[in-house]
Amino acid sequence: MLNAVFTFAFLLASAPPTDVTSLSWLSGRWAGSQDGTDMEEIWTDARGGTLLGMHRDVKGGKTVGFEFFRIEAVPEGLTYFASPQGRPPTPFRAVENRKDRVVFENKEHDFPTRILYWLGDGKLHARIEGTLRGQPASEEWTWSRQP
């Protein structure tokens, strides 16, 4: 009986947080520049069970890419819904959620299959990973917090 109690307590302690407020560190306006493209990512405060966000890339004064997303607490856990270029949302479930780092995964999606966010050196970093044309592929972004 005592072993069962300790096992249950351990499982609870090691389970990733399922409340969106655990991702409050994402909130704010973030901006950066990469290869001549100005990038911005904006996340709302974690309220009402969701974080809402958007990303925009501007090059030569024109928007060349955008994405809407939300992170929501659903029965299966924290889920990131990505809508690149305004397409229907694709869900990615949180497989890791710790202080200043979160990893979402959808192994059934073509690309990416993983989305990672983390804080480091006072900057927000994101990385997507997966397979393209049978080869491992990834892309990474870095933004600085804006006023």
Which role does the model predict for each range below?
Residues 26-27, 32-108:
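Central antiparallel beta-sheet cores of small beta-barrel/beta-sandwich binding domains
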